[in-house]
Amino acid sequence: MSKPIVIALGEILWDMLPTGKRAGGAPVNFAYHASQNCAESYAISAVGNDELGAELLNDAHKAGINTLVQTNEYPTGTVAVALTNGIPEYTIVQNVAWDHIGYTDELAEAVSKADAICFGTLGLRSQESHDTIIKLLQHTKEGALKFFDINLRANFYSKELIEELLGYANIFKINDDELIMMREMFSIPEGNDEEACKWFMDRFDLEYTILTGGATFSTIIAKDGETSTLLTPHVEVADTVGAGDSFSGSFTGKILSGASLKEAHRAAVNTAAYVCTKEGGWPAYPTEGVPDYLAAAAK
């Protein structure tokens, strides 16, 4: 039986951590973790014709990510990451290779075969990549999961962009801090966080809305009314880079493989906890599988 196909659209880059550089970019982090959870993953992005670009593609291939990555004359993307108690702050270099992803029929054909697509706001910050990604989203097949992780960074977003991307999505992931901003931006009626998530579901006809609360909880609401809430297990944190993306990729891979909402949610929480114990967004998975931190916490 063939594996489901997952495609990530947007940034591929180096996270320049205090301990050294690590391959990353939210959509590609997603693709990596989907590939570790029963999916065949591809990244659509761009790197520069430079040493960093060649090294980045090599790392992606070694990690099991198939790349549909263009090479252009702009520098490969980098992000300076400062860590405070393991929590990252990002300084994102502008006008880099992934700001110049060009549309091709080959990319459109790949997207048309995907069972799931992942995208966020950052990858569309430039007009060129915005136009390409929007055009590619128009080629998704019926029934595909279209995962929009809002993933707000710096000032690289607007209400118009968020509305546009929600119009293409059927899964929406947002964290509790971002939800506060979205309440004001969209003038969401007063109510608890779950009601605010349901507001997005109703307005944009979403299949799932995912709300994460970092070190405390996560809630997933399905269109049919099923809800799953899990507390975040406590682990010794190396850094949280890519943890949210690992949650998303794991959840999507499991759903595509036939897992129930609760099964997929549990796998996502355990995966994110595991990633927090490692440096960078693409840690190797244990041969025996990710530990069941939730089971350990329940004892």
What are these regions (language model features)?
Residues 5, 145, 171, 207-208:
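Proline-centered loop/turn at the N-terminus of a beta-strand
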Residues 40-121, 293-299:
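Conserved N-terminal subdomain of the carbohydrate kinase-like
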Residues 1-65, 79, 236:
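Glycine-rich phosphate/adenosyl-contacting loop at the front of the ribokinase-like
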Residues 116, 121-195, 217:
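Conserved beta-alpha-beta core of the PfkB/ribokinase-like small-molecule kinase fold
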Residues 34, 175, 244:
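Short, conserved phosphate/pyrophosphate- and ester-handling motifs at nucleotide-, phospho-/glycolipid
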Residues 109-110, 164-165, 202:
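Structural alpha-helical scaffold elements that stabilize or flank donor/cofactor-binding regions
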Residues 1-4, 190-299:
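Conserved phosphate-binding/catalytic region of the ribokinase-like
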